[in-house]
Amino acid sequence: MDAEPDGSALAEDLRAAVAAHLEAVGALDAEAVAAGFAADAVFSTDDDQAVGQREVYTLFRDAFADAATVDLELARMVVAGDTAACELTERIRWRSGATLELRLAAFYTVSGGLITRVRVYRFLPG
């Protein structure tokens, strides 16, 4: 993982929040995912939007329902202020055996060690 050389406390909070999020997703743990978000946080993709911890929990619980494994590999993170821009690869294997690999760009905003906003852009294969 490459990271911009910003040693500030906020940058460290950002890196820690992103790392915890990726770990919780990899563990298919919707409760741990939601715990990393502020009470009024917003998580959005082109297809979904969740506002608040409860909706974040529900979104991830439903997303994990048919997943056997999810791996989010962080290739690069650039920190600017309270936001981290991340390049990721998402690998999903469903219980059916089907697999999917996507490239992602995700922007995380953090305050007080909690994620307040995530915007994910997926680059579909083909």
Which sequence ranges carry the predicted segments?
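Short beta-strand edge/turn micro-motifs at domain boundaries
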Residues: 103-126
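Short, low-complexity N-terminal intrinsically disordered segments enriched in polar/charged residues
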Residues: 1-36
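A solvent-exposed, acidic/Ser-Thr-rich amphipathic alpha-helical stretch
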Residues: 30-81
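Short, cysteine-centered beta-strand-loop-beta hairpins and adjacent loop/turn segments enriched
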Residues: 92-101
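Hydrophobic beta-strand positions in extracellular immunoglobulin-like domains
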Residues: 90-92, 110
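A short hydrophobic beta-strand element
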Residues: 81-90
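Short, surface-exposed coil-to-beta transition loops
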Residues: 71-73, 100-106
